[in-house]
C-alpha cells in the first residue's frame, strides 16, 4: 500500500514500485506489476504517455512480429534476450490485443499492425494500468535519485518519493523531439554500470559524393522493391528508397544497424533476375533495343535513363561485347557505395548499445550492481530488427521485471 515516510524532516510518499518512463516498456511493466498486487507509481517528464507508440508504424503501430526470435536482436551479449522473449512471446501480447478487441493484421514478413490507429495499443496499456490502480504522473522531472537501505529515494519536481523497487524504462536517444534523453544511462552510470557506446540504429544513410548524391536527389521518392542490401556479411531483402540526402527504406534501415562509419554497402537491385542470362537473351531477341529501353522495363523510366546515363553507355544491345554486358549485370547486382554517415538520432527508430547486459539479470532485469534497481526496454544493449521486434522486447523485458519488482 502507498504510505508516507518521514526522511530528514520532510514527507516522502512511499510506493513499493516506482517506474520512470511511460513509454511501451514502462506502461507494460506498471500494468503487470500492479496486476500482481504491487502499488505502482509511474512517472514521466513528458505531458503525455506513449508518444513513440503513437507515431510508430506510420501511426498504426507495428506492435510485434509473428516470427520473433532471439536472432532478430543485436547485443554485445546475444544470449541475454532469450529468457525474457521465451517467457513472454509475441503470442502473449497478441492475446492481450485480442482481449481488448483491437483489430489487427499482418502487413508482411510477420509484421502485425493495428487496423485502425496506434492509439489502440496505447489505450490498451492505459486501460490495463487503470484497471490495476497504477498511479500515473506526467510532467514530472527527476532531479536526484538516492540509494537508501532497502530501496531508493527520488527528489522530483512533484515532491519526494521512495520505493523498494525502482524501474528505469526511459528508452534510448532516438527521436529527441519526442522527449528522448540520456537519463537512463546517467542513472546506470550513477549506480556503477558499464555503458556500451551508443549510436543511431534503423536509420537512413546520407550520401555526400557529388555524383551519387545527385543521383539520389534526382530519384528522391523513388522506391525499388525487394533489393538485397549487404554489409559486413549481413543481408536484408526489402525495399530501398532514394531521398534528397541519400538512401532510406526498410532494407537500408535494417542494414544501418550493422554498418560502421567507413564501411561499404552492396545493393543487388534485381536479385530476382539472373541478369547475365537475361541480358544475353535480350541481346539475341532484341538486338536493336537500347539499354535504357531495357532498364525501363525493370525500373521507372526516369531511373532507367539516369542509370544508363551515369553508369553505362546506352547503345543498341547488339553493340555490347559479352564483357560489357557482364559489367552491366555486375553493376546492377553489386552496386557498392560508402555512405557518408546516417541521419542520426533525429530520425533513428532505435539506439544501439546502452547499458551492458552482463551486469543485469536476464531473468529479472535487476541490476547486479545495485539491488532493487531494474532496467527494461531500449535503455539496455538490446536492439531489434525493423518490423515489431523492438516493441516485443519492450513487452518481454517489462513482463520479466514485473514478476520480481
Model-identified regions with their sequence ranges:
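N-terminal Rossmann-like FAD-binding beta1-loop-alpha1 element of flavoenzymes
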Residues: 15-42, 401-405
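Short hydrophobic core segments
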Residues: 18-20, 142, 161-177, 240-243
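Glycine-rich FAD pyrophosphate-binding loop
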Residues: 34-58
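An anion/pyrophosphate-binding glycine-rich loop and adjacent beta-alpha core
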Residues: 47-49, 54-55, 63-70, 103, ...
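Glycine-rich active-site loop/strand segments that organize a redox cofactor
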Residues: 60-106
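Feature captures the FAD/FMN-dependent oxidoreductase FAD-binding
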Residues: 87-165
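A glycine-rich dinucleotide-binding beta-alpha-beta segment and adjacent secondary-structure elements
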Residues: 138, 305-383
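Glycine-rich loop(s) and the adjacent beta-strand/alpha-helix scaffold that form part
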Residues: 165-209
Amino acid at each position: 500500500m502507498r504510505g508516507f515516510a518521514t526522511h530528514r524532516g520532510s514527507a516522502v510518499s512511499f510506493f513499493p514500485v516506482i517506474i520512470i518512463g511511460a513509454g511501451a516498456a514502462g506502461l507494460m511493466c506498471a500494468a503487470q506489476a500492479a496486476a500482481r498486487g504491487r502499488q505502482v507509481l509511474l512517472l514521466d517528464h513528458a505531458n503525455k504517455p506513449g508518444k513513440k507508440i503513437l507515431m510508430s508504424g506510420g501511426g498504426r503501430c507495428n506492435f510485434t512480429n509473428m516470427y520473433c526470435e532471439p536472432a532478430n536482436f543485436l547485443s554485445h551479449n546475444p544470449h541475454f534476450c532469450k529468457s525474457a522473449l521465451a517467457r513472454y512471446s509475441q503470442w502473449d501480447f497478441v492475446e492481450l490485443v485480442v482481449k481488448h478487441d483491437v483489430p489487427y493484421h499482418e502487413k508482411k514478413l510477420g509484421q502485425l499492425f493495428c487496423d485502425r490507429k496506434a492509439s489502440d495499443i496505447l489505450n490498451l496499456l492505459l486501460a490495463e494500468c487503470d484497471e490495476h490502480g497504477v498511479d500515473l504522473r506526467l510532467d514530472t522531472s527527476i532531479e536526484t535519485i538516492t540509494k537508501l537501505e532497502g530501496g531508493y529515494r527520488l527528489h522530483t519536481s512533484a515532491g519526494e518519493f521512495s520505493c523498494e523497487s525502482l524501474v528505469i524504462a526511459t528508452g534510448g536517444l532516438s527521436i529527441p523531439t519526442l522527449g528522448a534523453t540520456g537519463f537512463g544511462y546517467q542513472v546506470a552510470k550513477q549506480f556503477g554500470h558499464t555503458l556500451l557506446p551508443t549510436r543511431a540504429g534503423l536509420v537512413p544513410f546520407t550520401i555526400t559524393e557529388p555524383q551519387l548524391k545527385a543521383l539520389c536527389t534526382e530519384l528522391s521518392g523513388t522506391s525499388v522493391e525487394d533489393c538485397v542490401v549487404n554489409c559486413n556479411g549481413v543481408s536484408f531483402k526489402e525495399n530501398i528508397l532514394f531521398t534528397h540526402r541519400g538512401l532510406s527504406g526498410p532494407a537500408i534501415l535494417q542494414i544501418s544497424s550493422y554498418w560502421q562509419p567507413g564501411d561499404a554497402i552492396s545493393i543487388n537491385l534485381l536479385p530476382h533476375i539472373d541478369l547475365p542470362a537475361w541480358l544475353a537473351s535480350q541481346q539475341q531477341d532484341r538486338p536493336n533495343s537500347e539499354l535504357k529501353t531495357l532498364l525501363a522495363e525493370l525500373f521507372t523510366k526516369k531511373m532507367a535513363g539516369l542509370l544508363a546515363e551515369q553508369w553505362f553507355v546506352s547503345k543498341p544491345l547488339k553493340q555490347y561485347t559479352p564483357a560489357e554486358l557482364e559489367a552491366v549485370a555486375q553493376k546492377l547486382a553489386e552496386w557498392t557505395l560508402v555512405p557518408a554517415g546516417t541521419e542520426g538520432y533525429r530520425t533513428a527508430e532505435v539506439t544501439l548499445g546502452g547499458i551492458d547486459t552482463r551486469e543485469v539479470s536476464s531473468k529479472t532485469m535487476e541490476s547486479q550492481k545495485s539491488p532493487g534497481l531494474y532496467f527494461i526496454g531500449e535503455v539496455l544493449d538490446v536492439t531489434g530488427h525493423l518490423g515489431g521486434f523492438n516493441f516485443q522486447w519492450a513487452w518481454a523485458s517489462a513482463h520479466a521485471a514485473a514478476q520480481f519488482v
